[in-house]
Amino acid sequence: MHPNISLPEPFIASMAKILPDPTQLADFIAACQRPLRKSIRVNTLKISVAEFCQRAAEKEWQLTPVPWCENGFWIDADESLVPLGNTAEHMAGLFYIQEASSMMPVSALFMGNAHYDSVLDMAAAPGSKTTQMAALMDNQGVLVANEFSASRVKVLHANIERCGIRNTALSNFDGCVFGGWLPERFDAVLIDAPCSGEGTIRKDPDAMKNWSLESIQSIANTQKALIESAFQALKVGGTLVYSTCTLSREENQQVCWHLKQTYGDAVSFESLGNLFEHASLALTEEGFLHIFPQMYDCEGFFVAKIRKLASVPTPEVNKRLGKFPFNKASHKQQAEIAQQLHKSLGIELPSDAQVWLRDNDVWLFPEALEPLLGELRFSRMGIKIAEAHKSGYRWQHQVATCLASSSASHSVELDTTQAREWFMGRDVRPEGQSGQGEVIIRYANDVIGLGKWVGNRVKNGLPRELVRDKNLF
């Protein structure tokens, strides 16, 4: 039990009115006061689900499949000595700690093995859904990950970096700008909207601290502006998923109906009744999923899937972006960089990526990003792969974690003690080995970074945001 969880009487009264079965009110309250089951999602950019399950069994982790996400599991693991977030598997990006309900919006967006070349994640931090979508896109196409809060962009980037993702472009704007700045540019848009967080009670005892009916209405007005912008940015025929981790109809069904009332027949609601077995328990008349915590023993959540059937008016805007600071590498330059990368580390450049240059920095952008360059100011695009020096190229961390395979020949395998040192940002000395230049670092056959030989020592190249200081595996 969570005895500290306080449910305001007006909140309980409002829930009693909207529960699909009013007799479930006691079950709803009891569910809100139960601790939340921990869940994870396997990052298939790094490891297959079958391989991960085998490794989990070796660690005596008990996994229970999440029915709406084939890569998701509830997990029962002994964290008395090492938290899940400090395990080698997590730090190597093999899995993401993600609440089970929050896996549902992305599953809805990619339902039926849908394929998209350009996707917008309008409110992306901390990155659970961005990384989930990148894995389903298999690092192909372009995924614009926007976050309004500048401080949260750092966390978003760290998670993208840890998970070996290379097809993202990060931006830092109010989501309301996209309809005017990038009208009809995306095959799919996910808006996991800022909300009152009523569904998060089980993991946050203070979730209801500032709850009020007045604040819900204010938040709903923001959500309506965001869903309009998301719909405007969507191509005709494209798919929009709107989701929240809250329960009120004002922030959920009524926001979707606002879109329908605004754009009429251009808006089509698509049923999620077949998303997973027993989805009918949460299905609304419109085909949305309105999930209360007692239904599937998870967080409260709402998911709606919407199709755009026709163009709609978009705002006229005046953009002042300034000169784009990157230059596209010539075919000759890209070929030279590709040759040097293969010679140094045995790594091939992906065929769907382009090399761009900024001063001495060498970047790899997703090819599908090029039409958006000059249309929006991005805070970070693709991955930095090298710095050019007189003596050649100095390769960067993400060239290993995003492009190298576990069978990489130009690599060194660390033992457990050395791997702990590595993740704490320290140099390592592999026994009986020495070399020159950069070297791919592996642990348990997973690529965990890039170092540089200095005699018999490997200089640590782990980015600062990924360094841990204690309590490691």
UniProtKB/Swiss-Prot annotation:
Q: Which reaction does it catalyse?
A: cytidine(1407) in 16S rRNA + S-adenosyl-L-methionine = 5-methylcytidine(1407) in 16S rRNA + S-adenosyl-L-homocysteine + H(+)
| GO BP term, pick one | rRNA base methylation
Alphabetized, the UniProt keywords read: Cytoplasm, Methyltransferase, RNA-binding, rRNA processing, S-adenosyl-L-methionine, Transferase
Q: What SUPFAM superfamilies does the record tag this protein with?
A: S-adenosyl-L-methionine-dependent methyltransferases
Q: What class of enzyme is it?
A: transferase
**Where is it located?**
Cytoplasm
Query: InterPro entries from the entry?
Result: Methyltr_RsmF_N (IPR031341), MeTrfase_RsmB-F_NOP2_cat (IPR049560), MeTrfase_RsmB-F_NOP2_dom (IPR001678), Nol1_Nop2_Fmu_2 (IPR027391), Nop2p (IPR011023), RCMT (IPR023267), rRNA_ssu_MeTfrase_F (IPR023545), RsmB/NOL1/NOP2-like_CS (IPR018314)
Supply the HAMAP family for this chain: 16SrRNA_methyltr_F (MF_01579)
Its biological purpose is as follows: Specifically methylates the cytosine at position 1407 (m5C1407) of 16S rRNA.
The family classification in the record reads:
Belongs to the class I-like SAM-binding methyltransferase superfamily. RsmB/NOP family.
What's the protein here called? Ribosomal RNA small subunit methyltransferase F
**Which organism's genome codes for this protein?**
Vibrio cholerae serotype O1 (strain ATCC 39315 / El Tor Inaba N16961)
Q: Source taxonomy lineage?
A: Bacteria, Pseudomonadati, Pseudomonadota, Gammaproteobacteria, Vibrionales
